[in-house]
C-alpha cells in the first residue's frame, strides 16, 4: 500500500455508483482502483499465510476500535429482534430497522477510530453502511462483502491502519465481521443475492475462502480433501477460516457436500492449498470484479476513484458507440444478456435463506437449535 492519500487540502466525496454498462466495467478493470483493490487482497493474503485465527492477538491501538465498532453493530442487531413473520420464509422486515439504526450510529462509531480525519468520515462511512446488506431487498451478497473490503482499504489509504496491522485486519477485524454477518443472516433470514448459492462456495461469502486457503497454504499436513473429515473440521475450524466455513455450511445443510456445495467438493480434489489459493484469486477477479451484475453496485469516491472519459479515451469512445446493450430492471439493476457465470443471477427469483428454509413455521418443539436460536434445523438444500 502506498503512502497515505490524505492531506489538509484533500477533498473528500460521498461515494456513488459509476458502472452503468460494459464500457464502464471495462474502464474499471483498467483503472488504478481495480489494481488497488486486488493488490490489497493479495497483500492481506500473503500476510496471513500459516497464521491461525486463534493467534490473531488483541490488535493494536489502531485496530482495536474497529473490533469495538463491529461489536456495536452486533449490539444494535441484538436490540432489534426480528418481527413475527411466520408466514414468510424470506427476509425479515426488522432488518430495515437495523439498517437504519446502523446508519444513524455510523458517524459516532467512526469517531472512535484514531487518526481518521473527521472530514473523511462522510466518504468512508458509506462503504461501512453498505456492508450489512441491501435494505430494499433484505439480501446480502458479494457486493456488500466488497464494500467492507473497500472500507478497510480506505482506512489503509488514509494511514489509519498500517502494514503491520494487516494480519489482524483479516484474522481479527474481517473475521469478526463474518461472525456479525452470520448473526444477521440467521436472525433476519437475509436472502442470498443470487439464486445459485452465489458462487457455489457459500450462500453469501467469498473472501473467507480466498483468505482461508491462503492461511493453509504451507500447512504440513492438512490438504484440501480434509474438508470431508468431520474430526479435522471439529479440531481445526477454530483456527482456519476455510474449515470454519465448511463446518458452518455442514451445520445448516444435510446430505453430502457434493449435493449442496458441488464447487467446494470439486475444489477439495485439488492437490495443494497453493493451487486452491491461486484459483480463488483468479475467480474473485473474474466473478466479482469482472461481472457487471456485481460491480454495478460498486461505489467510488476520492479514495477509490472511477476514471473519467477524459482520463480514459477508451471509455469515452466506447460510451459513444454503446447503445442499449444493458437493460435496467424494476430494482434499478443492470443486466447484460451476454453475461455468463455464477454472478449473472444478481436478482433472479428471490431465494429464502438456509435459515428461513429450515424454520418450522408452526412450532419450535423438538427442533434442534443453531447458535442458541431455536427452530433452525439442517436442511437438504436451499
Swiss-Prot record:
PANTHER family: SERINE/THREONINE-PROTEIN PHOSPHATASE 2A REGULATORY SUBUNIT B, SERINE_THREONINE-PROTEIN PHOSPHATASE 2A ACTIVATOR 2
Catalytic reaction annotation: [protein]-peptidylproline (omega=180) = [protein]-peptidylproline (omega=0)
Enzyme class per UniProt: isomerase
Chief location bin: cytoplasm
InterPro entries, sorted: Phstyr_phstse_ac (IPR004327), PTPA_C_lid (IPR043170), PTPA_sf (IPR037218)
Keyword Thylakoid assigned: no
Annotated region (Disordered), positions in chain: 363-382
Protein name, UniProt field: Serine/threonine-protein phosphatase 2A activator 2
Keyword annotations: Cytoplasm, Isomerase, Rotamase
Gene Ontology MF terms: peptidyl-prolyl cis-trans isomerase activity; protein tyrosine phosphatase activator activity
Pfam families: PTPA
